[in-house]
Amino acid sequence: MFVSFTDWEFDGNVENAVENMKGFWPEMKKHGATNMRATVTGEKTLRTMTIWSSEEQVKANIDEIRAAAGKAVGMTTTGGMMRKVAVELE
């Protein structure tokens, strides 16, 4: 499994951000996303954690995915990173 973390700046309306992310989710799944979580990190910032099925697929498309997501959900990317998942516990 492969994970990406993306930091976003938005207008502060969490409900709208959540609805917009839900609306864009099918597009992310087309690129191999299998799971996404978002955490509000500040008054107008949040961080998403997305699990991807293919490291190669996400690495080849991450800039395009982030740009399209930002446009679709009305948020601006402020940072991010990608790595292999080291451990998953339930």
Model-derived features with residue positions:
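Short S/T/G/P-rich N-terminal loop/turn motif that feeds into the first structured element of a domain
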Residues: 1-67, 74-90
